[in-house]
Swiss-Prot record:
Subcellular location: Cytoplasm
InterPro entries: Chap_CCT_alpha (IPR012715), Chaperone_TCP-1 (IPR017998), Chaperonin_TCP-1_CS (IPR002194), Cpn60/GroEL/TCP-1 (IPR002423), GroEL-like_apical_dom_sf (IPR027409), GROEL-like_equatorial_sf (IPR027413), TCP-1-like_intermed_sf (IPR027410), TCP-1_chaperonin (IPR053374)
Organism: Schizosaccharomyces pombe (strain 972 / ATCC 24843)
Name of the molecule in the record: T-complex protein 1 subunit alpha
Presence of keyword Transmembrane: no
GO biological process: protein folding
Disulfide bond residue pairs: none
Main location: cytoplasm
Keyword terms of this UniProt record: ATP-binding, Chaperone, Cytoplasm, Nucleotide-binding
């Protein structure tokens, strides 16, 4: 008699999913995303080939790149894609593992909800677990870079490269990455030492083998001088950085000038030329001997620049000029007009560098800005057989540079190869049993979820994951149960997987290291993303509005 109103009556156009269904859907979406990148984890991970709608091909191993090229429709899936991009932006590496951990945490949380554990309890448990994990990682697992020396920096870069296309030449490239980061060392206003990744410019040149790549001290611009009559080297450079056109100034469209004397027409033309020439003169009079601009330069202006013995480069990338301006202390100007509307150029706008020179790499020429005043910069010129491998090399290099930066700034590293995850897993299992509340179930599941990393690593290396993970757990359990005095057993905490030989080894001695900051960030981000999705219990999707049909549609 009293019928419960159907849910559909509330929404005229759309669907409402709630309770278990929405959780299952979310888990399904996140697992699908994690499965896409799962097989690319680790030193023997495989690459993915992505073809977009116009047919552009990308071959990559980088989790963030793979996910950003996918067109994900499900909102829960989008959360994971954003998570990978965030990790890429903040740390640069660990994008694949962060997605895998988040998806696994969510899957296990969903199983608990099915067993009648309230999501809030699970969330509290996860938060407790991450707090303990972070504490254990910083106190016990991480070791300082100073105690391991510069070698450890190279090892950190090698570990980051091991899964990438340049993994075979990791000795060569890791040294290059470390040297590049050390050469751009700078300190900010608070006196903290910083290593800006953006100060390292990466150029790609086709041809030769990847081992012929070079690290150049100075900022390399993929441009050439505007005229062959110019100098190709300027010492003690004073650099003007412009984002404006030095072509002849044409009158704006729609301007009508009525003249009754042909001489006046000639005067107008002369004036058009003179305006730009005056601009160039102002810049040269301020002491500039190198002019870099994003737009074109007129031939007449080039003549006066050549006569002044200066150097000009046109059509540079704006992003490059922004970085050069920052490094040399110049101001990037988009117009010479000051607040009064008069055109001026002051010498304070100029940046300074020891020299600006045009050099030749294989068949390509590029401009190098060396010895910039504000902070030094470095450039890496990558060589490779084709565009796909060069793009992938650039991504791998970026990851390695970011990892070296994080290691230098935080000064702490942890062993790689699944060592951290296994150690945390054992620690959290023991911690869970010490609790009496329901949260212990969530913490135990959290501990199990972390083992997905060593398992996936082993599976990708075509090794027996069950056996290797069990061995690894045994080592870490022995380490955590050992007496403080038993140094040998305590040292087992650094044991991780050696995936090439399928054995367990001390990864600190083997040089498989990762910045502890990367691990901390990825764990925290994974838990936050998982909790965000876990809190969702209803999803309401509205249908797109239907446009009323035009009755005159066929009559036009």
């Amino acid at each position: 008699m009293f019928q419960a109103p159907r849910e559909s009556t509330l929404f005229l156009s759309g669907e409402k999913i709630s309770g278990e269904d929405v959780r299952n859907q979310n888990v399904l979406a996140t697992t699908a995303i994690a499965n896409v990148v799962k097989s690319s984890l680790g030193p023997v991970g495989l690459d993915k080939m992505l073809v977009d709608d116009i047919g552009d091909v990308t071959v990559t191993n980088d989790g963030a790149t793979i996910l950003s090229l996918l067109d994900v429709e499900h909102p829960a899936g989008k959360v994971l894609v954003e998570l990978a991009q965030q990790q890429d932006k903040e740390v640069g590496d660990g994008t694949t593992s962060v997605v895998i951990i988040a998806a696994e945490l969510l899957r296990r949380a969903n199983e608990l909800v099915k067993n009648k554990i309230h999501p809030t309890t699970i969330i509290t448990g996860y938060r407790l677990a991450i707090r303990e994990a972070v504490k254990f990682m910083t106190d016990v697992l991480s070791c300082s870079v100073d105690s391991l020396g510069k070698e450890s920096l190279i090892n950190v870069a090698k570990t980051s490269m091991s899964s990438k296309i340049i993994g075979n030449d990791s000795d060569f490239f890791s040294t290059m990455a470390v040297d590049a980061m050390l050469s751009v060392k700078t300190s900010n206003s608070k006196g903290e030492t910083r290593y800006p990744v953006k100060a390292v410019n990466i150029l790609k040149a086709h041809g030769k083998s990847s081992r012929e790549s070079v690290l150049v001290k100075g900022y390399a611009l993929n441009c050439t001088i505007a005229s062959q009559a110019m100098k190709t080297r300027v010492q003690n450079a004073k650099i003007a950085v412009l984002d404006m056109d030095l072509q002849k100034t044409k009158m704006a469209l729609g301007v009508h000038v009525t003249i009754d004397d042909p001489d006046q027409l000639e005067k107008i033309r002369e004036r058009e030329v003179m305006i730009t020439l005056e601009r160039v003169k102002k810049i040269l009079n301020a002491g500039a001997n190198v002019i870099l601009t994003t737009k074109g330069i007129d031939d007449l202006c080039l003549k006066s620049i050549i006569e002044a013995g200066a150097m000009a480069v046109r059509r540079c990338k704006k992003e490059d000029l922004r970085r050069i301006a920052k490094a040399s202390g110049a101001t990037l100007l988009s117009s010479l007009s000051n607040l009064e509307g008069e055109e001026t150029f002051e010498s304070s706008y100029l940046g300074s560098a020891e020299e600006v020179v045009q050099e030749k790499f294989s068949d390509d020429e590029c401009i190098l800005v060396k010895g910039t005043k504000a902070y030094s910069s470095a450039s890496i010129v990558l060589r490779g057989p084709n565009e796909y491998s060069l793009d992938e090399m650039e991504r791998s290099m970026h990851d390695s540079l970011s990892v070296v930066k994080r290691t230098l700034e935080s000064g702490k590293v942890v062993p790689g190869g699944g060592a951290v995850e296994t150690a945390l897993s054992i620690y959290l299992e023991n911690f869970a049993t010490s609790l009496g509340s329901r949260e212990q179930l969530a913490i135990a599941e959290f501990a199990q979820a972390l083992l997905i990393i060593p398992r996936t690593l082993a599976v990708n290396a075509a090794k027996d994951s069950t056996e290797l993970t069990a061995k690894l757990r045994a080592y870490h359990a022995a380490s955590q149960n050992a007496e403080v005095t038993d140094v040998k057993k305590r040292g087992y905490k650094n044991y991780g997987l050696d995936l090439l030989n399928g054995v367990i080894r001390d990864n600190v001695k083997a040089g498989v290291l990762e910045p502890s900051m990367s691990k901390l960030k990825s764990l925290k981000s994974a838990v936050e993303a998982c909790i965000a999705i876990l809190r969702i219990d209803t999803s309401i999707k509205l249908d797109p509005e239907r446009q009323p049909e035009d009755p005159h549609a066929g009559l036009h």
